[in-house]
Design a protein with these regions (language model features):
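Catalytic-core helical/loop segments in enzymes performing group transfer/polymerization on anionic/lipid-linked
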Residues: 1-212
Length: 212
């Protein structure tokens, strides 16, 4: 565990979450420039790209790191006396090891609480609509966020990763093709067709000349 004691509060207009590669970061550059670099926080997962984008605001998420000490101690206390026994009972009843799931939920809660309590923003967006997290979205709204959003990266297939999406706004590829997400138990309050961010960065912005 790597913990922090001092809380430094910052304000942004937009937080871009779950950035996992330099290529993905490049796709967001136009949106970041629209808001202004100083008004956007980019959250990466287990890797650093600050050297490539030195004038952007970054925060790197690593499991159970950069958490606030008192939040961590409180969580450990509650889990030792209550949570661990609930998870153990459910694991026995279902014959499924639920401890990895519980650890993931705890990590999401602690990191999201630290992130949003000290980095307040109006909007939250991510590229991978299948990695939305209800706990994260709840805490984002609790600490003053207006809307958690995501682009639609690809078609919604019959796969478990597309189950139970949790979003205020989905920026969809088109006017259809997203009903499966609702049927799979997802919460999407508003669907706004905008097209493909991948197509924009990978095709339209490159000005290809097509010979007729």
């Amino acid at each position: 565990f790597f913990c922090k004691f001092k809380k430094i509060k910052r304000k942004y207009d937009l937080i871009i979450d779950y950035i996992t590669s330099s290529i993905e970061m490049h796709r967001w550059k136009k949106l970041i420039n629209f808001f202004g670099k100083s008004h956007v926080l980019c959250v990466t997962r287990d890797f650093k790209i600050e050297s490539e984008y030195f004038d952007y605001n970054f925060k790197n998420q690593k499991k159970f790191q950069n958490l606030y000490f008192f939040d961590l101690i409180k969580s450990i206390f509650k889990e030792l006396f209550f949570g661990i026994w609930i998870v153990f009972k459910v694991s026995l009843k279902t014959k499924v090891n639920c401890f990895p799931i519980a650890l993931n939920i705890i990590n999401t809660y602690l990191f999201s609480k630290t992130l949003f309590e000290n980095n307040k923003a109006k909007f939250l967006i991510q590229e991978k609509h299948y990695n939305t997290e209800p706990v994260k979205n709840y805490l984002f709204k609790k600490y003053g966020g207006l809307a958690s959003t995501s682009i639609q990266k690809n078609i919604i297939a019959l796969e478990p990763i597309f189950f139970y999406l949790d979003l205020d706004i989905l920026f969809s590829l088109g006017e259809g093709g997203f009903k499966r997400a609702i049927n799979y138990g997802g919460r999407i309050d508003l669907i706004q067709p905008v097209g493909s961010l991948f197509m924009e960065r990978g095709w339209f912005d490159k000005n290809f000349k097509i010979k007729k």
